[in-house]
Amino acid sequence: MIALDQHLTEHKKDITQQWLEVCTSNGSWLYSAKDQQKLEQKLKDQHELLVTIVAKSLRKEDVEDELNRWSLQCARDRAVHEVTVTQSVGQFNTFRHIMFEWIHKFSEASSQDISIQEFYEWSRILNQNIDEIIEVFTEEYHQVTMIQLNAQKEMINELSAPIMPITDGIGILPLVGEIDTHRARTILESVLEQCSALKLSYLFLDISGVPIVDTMVAYQIFKVIDSTKLLGIETIISGIRPEIAQTVVKLGLDFSNVKTEQSLAKALANKGFKIKEC
């Protein structure tokens, strides 16, 4: 008499195909539409392997490491392809139900008497496996998506502080939008790298587009000026509003040696650049 684990392993392609058909009929899919054809075989291979792992566990083999590796890789794949946790957990539960159906059919078709206790034990092991998959999957998915979000945030922050060279040795840095501690630190690092790469002698820093300049922002601006000075770059600030000036005074920051102008146009004009009106 064929054993349950052997029966499931021999029918892993059928089980996987049934799972795929149920998922697609429910409007659920592992990958985005543009990737379906390319990655369908990978999806099949992945879930045929899962059938094999679960089958091994039903004959009381220790599959914890294999199950963890499978769950981690699955989480990374689905996070990269932007499949939601809700969709994924739903697909795991679909897999659970299909595997249970195959176990139930095997029990009914078996010529041997399968006790209620044995059937219950198979069900318990199956549920335990799927529960462990979901637990490991959701934790890893969260970690991967947080890394992705942080990387995107870093990229956005870097792009939000571009120095525009207007001639050899002269660049403009218009700051726009709210500045928090993280963005301020990124701006400082990005500005120093860009100034060095562009070989600037003068940097026009315009802050008229920053809605709120609090203590932290004012201090970071001062750090930018101080740091660029060490690189031999003269920084001219424009767009300082009265409330910004008050913040600087309250902080006790010494801007006496810093050149400031009311507007960027005036700052450029003082350096010999003529602003043509459209």
UniProtKB/Swiss-Prot annotation:
Gene3D superfamilies per record: Histidine kinase N-terminal domain, STAS domain
One protein family per Pfam: STAS
PTM info: Phosphorylated by RsbT.
Alphabetical list of SUPFAM superfamilies matching this protein: SpoIIaa-like
Key word Cell cycle present: no
Positions bearing Phosphothreonine: T181
Keyword annotations of the record: Phosphoprotein
Residues annotated as domain STAS: 160-271
Keyword field contains Cytoplasm: no
Observed effect of gene inactivation: Cells lacking this gene have no visible phenotype is response to salt, ethanol or energy stress. However cells with multiple disruption (RsbRA, RsbRB and RsbRD) have an increased basal level of sigma-B, indicating this protein is a negative regulator of sigma-B.
Superkingdom of this protein's organism: Bacteria
PANTHER family per record: RSBT ANTAGONIST PROTEIN RSBS-RELATED, RSBT CO-ANTAGONIST PROTEIN RSBRC
Assembly mode: Probably present in the stressosome with RsbRA, RsbRB, RsbRC and RsbS.
Function of the protein: One of 4 functionally non-identical RsbR paralogs, it functions in the environmental signaling branch of the general stress response. Negative regulator of sigma-B activity. Non-phosphorylated RsbS binds to RsbT, preventing its association with RsbU. Requires any one of RsbRA, RsbRB, RsbRC or RsbRD to sequester RsbT. When RsbS and the RsbR paralog(s) are phosphorylated, they release RsbT, which can then bind and activate RsbU.
Protein's name in the database: RsbT co-antagonist protein RsbRD
Organism, as annotated: Bacillus subtilis (strain 168)
Gene: rsbRD
